[in-house]
Amino acid sequence: MKHDIAAKLLQIGAVALQPNEPFTWSSGLKSPIYCDNRLTLAYPGVRRLIADALAELIRTHFPKADLIAGTAAGIPHAAWVSERLELPMCYVRSQAKRHGKGKQIEGQARPGQRVVVIEDLISTGGTSLAAVRALKEAGCEVLGVAAIFTYGLEKAKQAFAAENLPAYTLTDYNTLIETAVRLGAVSEHDLATLRQWRENPEEWGS
C-alpha cells in the first residue's frame, strides 16, 4: 500500500522532485521535494484510496477512537474517513477565531472523547501537535495522528516523542523516492542526492 499511495502522489503531481533545481520552503529551507496533497482532492479515485487506507489504519492502530479531528489541511480527508468509520468529526483551527465565539475547535469535541487527528502532511509536526494540544485542552484524549505522507524528518520524530504520541502515515519519503526511481521519475544518481537531503536537510544545498 505504501508504494501504491506513493505512486499515485507522483502520478498526479501532488509530490514533485527536483534534485537539481531545489524548491525553497516558506521556512527558507532548500529542498529537492515539494508536496501539495491538496491536489488529491481533484482525483476521486486517489482520494477514495487515501480515505479507505486512512480508515483501515485507524481501525488497526486506534480501534477505540470515537472522534476524528482534522487539521485545516486535513479537513476533507477527515470528513471522508469519519464517514467510513461512522464517527463524529470536528476540525481544529491553527488558532482561535478573533470574532464570534472565538472557537479553535469547530464541531464538537467533548471531554473524555478519544480522538485521532488527521493531517495531510507531516513536515516538522508543528501543525499536527498544535491541534493535539488544543484537543487536550478541551479535555479530549488524543490517541495519535494519521497522515498521508511524512518527510521523516528527525525534528518531527523528536516532537512526537516529546508528546509521547504515535503518528502513522500511509507512505513516506524513503518509499516515495524509491518509487520515483522505479517509475523513471528520477534517476539512480538522483536517488543519492535525495537521500542526502533526508539525512541533513538543514545543510543540504547550502
Swiss-Prot record:
Alphabetical list of Gene3D superfamilies matching this protein? 3.40.50.2020
What the record says about the induction of its expression is: Repressed by uracil.
The UniProt record lists the keyword Magnesium: yes
**Is Transferase given among the entry's keywords?**
yes
**Entry's CDD domains?**
PRTases_typeI
**One Pfam match, by short name?**
Pribosyltran
Summarize where 5-phospho-alpha-D-ribose 1-diphosphate binds, as residue positions: 93, 97, 99, 119-127
In short, the EC number is 2.4.2.10
Q: Which GO terms describe its molecular function?
A: magnesium ion binding; orotate phosphoribosyltransferase activity
Pathway of action: Pyrimidine metabolism; UMP biosynthesis via de novo pathway; UMP from orotate: step 1/2
| Subunit composition and interactions | Homodimer.
The name on file for this protein is: Orotate phosphoribosyltransferase
Species the sequence originates in:
Bacillus caldolyticus
